[in-house]
Amino acid sequence: MEARLVWGVLVGPLRVLCVLCCLLGHAIAAPSPIIKFPGDVSPKTDKELAVQYLNTFYGCPKESCNLFVLKDTLKKMQKFFGLPQTGDLDQNTIETMRKPRCGNPDVANYNFFPRKPKWDKNQITYRIIGYTPDLDPETVDDAFARALKVWSDVTPLRFSRIHDGEADIMINFGRWEHGDGYPFDGKDGLLAHAFAPGTGVGGDSHFDDDELWTLGEGQVVRVKYGNADGEYCKFPFLFNGREYSSCTDTGRSDGFLWCSTTYNFEKDGKYGFCPHEALFTMGGNGDGQPCKFPFRFQGTSYNSCTTEGRTDGYRWCGTTEDYDRDKKYGFCPETAMSTVGGNSEGAPCVFPFTFLGNKYESCTSAGRSDGKVWCATTTNYDDDRKWGFCPDQGYSLFLVAAHEFGHAMGLEHSQDPGALMAPIYTYTKNFRLSNDDIKGIQELYGPSPDADTDTGTGPTPTLGPVTPEICKQDIVFDGIAQIRGEIFFFKDRFIWRTVTPRDKPTGPLLVATFWPELPEKIDAVYEAPQEEKAVFFAGNEYWVYSASTLERGYPKPLTSLGLPPDVQQVDAAFNWSKNKKTYIFSGDKFWRYNEVKKKMDPGFPKLIADSWNAIPDNLDAVVDLQGGGHSYFFKGAYYLKLENQSLKSVKFGSIKSDWLGC
C-alpha cells in the first residue's frame, strides 16, 4: 500500500510549505458580515428556549406554559441548580439552560423512572449495538466498560457483555429521532439519555451521534502504519518549529494526513497516518479495504464518500469500482479534521477554501455571530455552500456513559453539582465518584461485597468527595477574586459567585464549568484588569485565561513569571488598583509584577511584615474590589480590610457573615 512510504517524502518541499503557511496565516482580512449558513439551526430566543427546557425537564406543558406557570416552574428549575429563585429569565438562568446536558428530566417522569425501579438481580448484561465513527471500536468498548465499572466498584452489581440477542442494557448511537420517541437535537444541547431498569427499553442507553465523542480532551486519533502503528496522535505536536493541533499533510507529496505520536517529532521521529478513506474503511463488508474512487452506485459515479442510500447520515464508499455489481462497501473513517454539524455529514475540512472572496488556511469564525469556528468542505464555499464546525474538545464518552448508566441502574438526577448524576456535563480529568452518587446507588443495591470490612478482610471502603456547604462548615477558601465584575470563591473543585458582598453567593458550581483545564485545587487567583485575563496558580505552575479559553502555551512554570525556583507555591495574588501592579504572596514574602512590562519589578521579594500593616504571613487570598478603594486580606475564617491610600486597617471581620450572607 502506498501509505507505507518512507518518511523521506516529507522533507522535499517542507520549508517552502511552512514559510508559505506562515505568510498566509498572518494575512489580515476585513471583518466579514454575519450570514445564514445552510443547514444551521437558528438559535432559539430566550423565551423559546425556556418553554422548551421547562417542558422537557420540568413537565411544564407547552400548550399551557403561560407566564404564571412559566414563572412558577422556572423557580423550581432555579432551585434545582442553586440559582437565585427569581422566576425571571436572568443571565445565569439562560446560561444554565444553554449548557450541554443529559436528556433525562430533572423531576420525576414516569416514562423514564416509574416508581423508582431497580434491577432485581446483580448480574447485568449489556450489548453495544452500534459505534460512533469519532472513535475506534476498541476505544468505545473500553469507555463503556470503564463507565460500568464506576458502579460495580461500589455495589454488588456485575456487568458482562454479550454480542448477540437481547441484553439488559442495549447501547447505541443515533441522531435526531432514533426510534424511541425522544429525539436528539443536533450538536450540543442533549448529549444522551437512558431508561430506568425494566423490560423492553428499560436500561437502554442512547448517545447523540451529532456530538463529537472523545475522551474529553480533543479528538482521539489512532494512527495506521508509519513507525507508530496503533498509537495515538499527540496534539499539539512540534514539527519544524511549528505546533500542529490536528493531522496535516504538510511536507508530503501524496496528500496523506499524518501526525506525530510524541510532542517533538524532530527529536523523536515517531509518526503514523491519520484515518482516511484512502487508507482503510470501517465496518461494512469490505474487510477494511480503502475506498475505490470513483465507484458506481445505482448507476451514478462517486468520487468521494457519500451518504446516499442511507437514512442515518453515515458516510460510506464502495471498496471496488462497482458497488452495483460487487456489493462491497465500508464506512469512511473520521479524520482529525472531520467536521461536526453543518451540512456536510462529517466530511473533512478542505484548506485553503474561499469564503466571501477571501482565502482561509485554517478554521475561522468569520461570518458567525456565536464565535464558533468552522470550515468549508470544498475549496469554495461561495460556490458550493458546504461547511461544518471544526472539531473542539468534544464530550468524554466515558463520563457521559457513566452518567447514563447511573440512570440505567435506577438513579435520577442529583442537585449536587459535584455528583456524576448532576444533569449538566462538565469534564473532569481525574474523575472520582462523589459521596452523593455512592449513597444513592448503595441505597438501591447495597455496598460492594469486596469492600466489606466486617470480617477484617478486603479493602477499606473510601467515601467519595463531599460537596461543601459554606454556611454549615468552616471553609478555608483556596482563592477569592473579582473576575469580570463578579466575586468568585474557590474551594477544591467548587466555586461560589456573587456580584455583591454580603449577598449569599450562587453555588456551589464546578470550577471546570468555567475553566475546564484547571486542576482540582488551586492555590491562588487574580484578574489582570488591564487585559481582562484571569490568572490561576497551582503548585509550581500558573494558567492564564481569556474568559473561559486557556491561553496558548499554558500552564507555565512559576519561574517564567520571574519567581525564583525555590518558590513552589503561591499563597495569594491580587492586582492593586492603587498602582496597577500585581502583588504575589508566598510564605512571609511578596513580589511585585509589572503587567505592562511583563516582568517582576526590581528590589523584590520583600517581607510582608515590613510593608503591609497588620497583614499575616501565609495568606489564603487577597482581593481589591473595583472602585471600592479598599483591599481585603483573607486568612482562615477572617479577613482584614485595608484602606488603599493610607494602608490603614479599617476592619477585622468574619468571612461568613460579611461575605457569604450566612
UniProtKB/Swiss-Prot annotation:
<feature type="binding site">
    <location>
        <position position="209"/>
    </location>
    <ligand>
        <name>Ca(2+) 1</name>
    </ligand>
</feature>
<dbReference type="InterPro" id="IPR021158">
    <property type="entry name" value="Pept_M10A_Zn_BS"/>
</dbReference>
<comment type="subunit">
    <text>Interacts (via the C-terminal hemopexin-like domains-containing region) with the integrin alpha-V/beta-3; the interaction promotes vascular invasion in angiogenic vessels and melamoma cells. Interacts (via the C-terminal PEX domain) with TIMP2 (via the C-terminal); the interaction inhibits the degradation activity. Interacts with GSK3B.</text>
</comment>
<dbReference type="InterPro" id="IPR018486">
    <property type="entry name" value="Hemopexin_CS"/>
</dbReference>
<dbReference type="GO" id="GO:0016477">
    <property type="term" value="P:cell migration"/>
</dbReference>
<dbReference type="InterPro" id="IPR001818">
    <property type="entry name" value="Pept_M10_metallopeptidase"/>
</dbReference>
<dbReference type="GO" id="GO:0051602">
    <property type="term" value="P:response to electrical stimulus"/>
</dbReference>
<dbReference type="GO" id="GO:0006979">
    <property type="term" value="P:response to oxidative stress"/>
</dbReference>
<feature type="disulfide bond">
    <location>
        <begin position="233"/>
        <end position="259"/>
    </location>
</feature>
<feature type="binding site">
    <location>
        <position position="168"/>
    </location>
    <ligand>
        <name>Ca(2+) 2</name>
    </ligand>
</feature>
<comment type="function">
    <text>Ubiquitinous metalloproteinase that is involved in diverse functions such as remodeling of the vasculature, angiogenesis, tissue repair, tumor invasion, inflammation, and atherosclerotic plaque rupture. As well as degrading extracellular matrix proteins, can also act on several nonmatrix proteins such as big endothelial 1 and beta-type CGRP promoting vasoconstriction. Also cleaves KISS at a Gly-|-Leu bond. Appears to have a role in myocardial cell death pathways. Contributes to myocardial oxidative stress by regulating the activity of GSK3beta. Cleaves GSK3beta in vitro.</text>
</comment>
<dbReference type="GO" id="GO:0007567">
    <property type="term" value="P:parturition"/>
</dbReference>
<keyword id="KW-0677">Repeat</keyword>
<dbReference type="GO" id="GO:0001968">
    <property type="term" value="F:fibronectin binding"/>
</dbReference>
<feature type="disulfide bond">
    <location>
        <begin position="247"/>
        <end position="274"/>
    </location>
</feature>
<feature type="domain" description="Fibronectin type-II 1">
    <location>
        <begin position="228"/>
        <end position="276"/>
    </location>
</feature>
<keyword id="KW-0862">Zinc</keyword>
<feature type="binding site">
    <location>
        <position position="407"/>
    </location>
    <ligand>
        <name>Zn(2+) 1</name>
    </ligand>
</feature>
<feature type="disulfide bond">
    <location>
        <begin position="349"/>
        <end position="375"/>
    </location>
</feature>
<feature type="domain" description="Fibronectin type-II 2">
    <location>
        <begin position="286"/>
        <end position="334"/>
    </location>
</feature>
<dbReference type="GO" id="GO:0009410">
    <property type="term" value="P:response to xenobiotic stimulus"/>
</dbReference>
<feature type="disulfide bond">
    <location>
        <begin position="363"/>
        <end position="390"/>
    </location>
</feature>
<feature type="region of interest" description="Collagenase-like 1">
    <location>
        <begin position="110"/>
        <end position="221"/>
    </location>
</feature>
<dbReference type="GO" id="GO:0030163">
    <property type="term" value="P:protein catabolic process"/>
</dbReference>
<feature type="binding site">
    <location>
        <position position="571"/>
    </location>
    <ligand>
        <name>Ca(2+) 4</name>
    </ligand>
</feature>
<dbReference type="GO" id="GO:0032526">
    <property type="term" value="P:response to retinoic acid"/>
</dbReference>
<keyword id="KW-0472">Membrane</keyword>
<dbReference type="GO" id="GO:0005634">
    <property type="term" value="C:nucleus"/>
</dbReference>
<keyword id="KW-0068">Autocatalytic cleavage</keyword>
<feature type="binding site">
    <location>
        <position position="413"/>
    </location>
    <ligand>
        <name>Zn(2+) 1</name>
    </ligand>
</feature>
<dbReference type="GO" id="GO:0014012">
    <property type="term" value="P:peripheral nervous system axon regeneration"/>
</dbReference>
<feature type="short sequence motif" description="Cysteine switch">
    <location>
        <begin position="100"/>
        <end position="107"/>
    </location>
</feature>
<feature type="binding site">
    <location>
        <position position="523"/>
    </location>
    <ligand>
        <name>Ca(2+) 4</name>
    </ligand>
</feature>
<dbReference type="GO" id="GO:1904645">
    <property type="term" value="P:response to amyloid-beta"/>
</dbReference>
<dbReference type="GO" id="GO:0035987">
    <property type="term" value="P:endodermal cell differentiation"/>
</dbReference>
<feature type="repeat" description="Hemopexin 1">
    <location>
        <begin position="474"/>
        <end position="518"/>
    </location>
</feature>
<dbReference type="InterPro" id="IPR000585">
    <property type="entry name" value="Hemopexin-like_dom"/>
</dbReference>
<dbReference type="GO" id="GO:0014823">
    <property type="term" value="P:response to activity"/>
</dbReference>
<keyword id="KW-0037">Angiogenesis</keyword>
<comment type="function">
    <text>PEX, the C-terminal non-catalytic fragment of MMP2, possesses anti-angiogenic and anti-tumor properties and inhibits cell migration and cell adhesion to FGF2 and vitronectin. Ligand for integrin alpha-v/beta3 on the surface of blood vessels.</text>
</comment>
<feature type="repeat" description="Hemopexin 4">
    <location>
        <begin position="616"/>
        <end position="662"/>
    </location>
</feature>
<feature type="binding site">
    <location>
        <position position="180"/>
    </location>
    <ligand>
        <name>Zn(2+) 2</name>
    </ligand>
</feature>
